[in-house]
Amino acid sequence: MANLFPALRTPLYNLITEQTTKLTTFGGWEMPVQFAGLKQEHQAVREKVGMFDISHMGKFVLTGQKVLAALQSLVPSDLDRLTPGKAQYTVLLNAQGGIIDDIIVYDQGKNPEGQERVTLIVNAATTVKDKQWLLEHLPEEIDFQDLSREKVLIALQGPEALTILQPLVDQNLGELPAFGHLEAEFLREKAFIARTGYTGEDGFEIMVSPEVGKQLWQTFGSKGVTPCGLGARDTLRLEAGMGLYGQDMNDETTPLEAGLGWLVHLDSKGDFIGRAVLTEQKANGVEKRLVGLEMLAKQIARHDYPILHNGEIMGIVTSGTLSPTLQKAIALGYVPTELAKVGQELEVEVRGKTYGIKVVKKLFYRSEQKPR
């Protein structure tokens, strides 16, 4: 039977399929898993520079009066700390404090009419859900523009990202801090450029029209930038201790459980959806926590593998891989708070057998070249 909902394709699909046939469906989109090979792509980003088509990500632009004030009631982070040209990584919460999605809020200042302009980047698989939630909770007078299928988004990541991108724009990108962003002229078009990424390295995410996006992909390729797929994107983010929505967090886990307590600013902001639950958890503690894990054997702990203590199932692995950089099997998983201390030894069940695993810091790898 034919698929009634065929996978979506990004504007770069034809260019990408000239470079690889290794594709998969992710978040409703047909995306490349790898090009030359996962290890080669991973190493390129860690040591030089790689590029990712991330056009499948959701892209919303909100315009109107008091846009940030309206968003304040939907996230636990204090958006009053934002200034034009800066961004905040945060989460949308439901009434139970569960994470609807993790997002980035970009404050683009005011337009010539004096209206606030805010860009939101959200996960591909949750774009429809997020849009519905936002439209239900934001004031009607705020203009909501969904550019998810209208714009290309390319991530240029790695220590040489600045060297590659700088000659293409007039502004001094070296002065842009982490989570800083600006609009720059590129091929006679305004490009949105942010110093953000999902790899643990320095890098930029560039949003442009499909026409310019195709030229940009080809330009980067001509400069020797390695095209990278979802496989390397996953190993890179896991080494950097970055959670993946739908695996490491979902609408039943709170930010305090998911290791995102630094996003919760209870003392400096007013009410927001889910505040009561987070206030209670902050006061009394959480029952489970997302932790970093390192295998003591050569096995790899994968998503949904049970975590045991003294033979009893106590938790679950949410993400796991063999780290190309560290040459160790690493993972993220939820365990009871009393078993979440660094150094705690546990077991994981792999295909019916148990192997040793220990709790470590979630930041498995830290780049020395990434701007702070």
Swiss-Prot record:
- One GO BP: glycine decarboxylation via glycine cleavage system
Q: What is its EC number?
A: 2.1.2.10
The catalysed reaction is: N(6)-[(R)-S(8)-aminomethyldihydrolipoyl]-L-lysyl-[protein] + (6S)-5,6,7,8-tetrahydrofolate = N(6)-[(R)-dihydrolipoyl]-L-lysyl-[protein] + (6R)-5,10-methylene-5,6,7,8-tetrahydrofolate + NH4(+)
**Which Pfam families does the entry link to?**
GCV_T, GCV_T_C
Gene3D superfamilies in alphabetical order: Aminomethyltransferase beta-barrel domains, Aminomethyltransferase fragment, Probable tRNA modification gtpase trme, domain 1
- Check the record and name the InterPro entries matching this protein: GCS_T (IPR006223), GCS_T_bac (IPR022903), GCST_C (IPR013977), GCV_T_N (IPR006222), GcvT/YgfZ/DmdA (IPR028896), GcvT/YgfZ_C (IPR029043), TrmE/GcvT_dom1 (IPR027266)
Molecular-function GO term, any one: transaminase activity
Gene Ontology cellular-component terms for this entry are: cytosol; glycine cleavage complex
Keywords, ordered alphabetically: Aminotransferase, Transferase
User: What's the top EC group for this one?
Assistant: transferase
Q: Which family does it belong to?
A: Belongs to the GcvT family.
UniProt function note: The glycine cleavage system catalyzes the degradation of glycine.
* Assembly information from the UniProt record: The glycine cleavage system is composed of four proteins: P, T, L and H.
- Name of this chain's protein: Aminomethyltransferase
The record lists the organism as: Synechocystis sp. (strain ATCC 27184 / PCC 6803 / Kazusa)
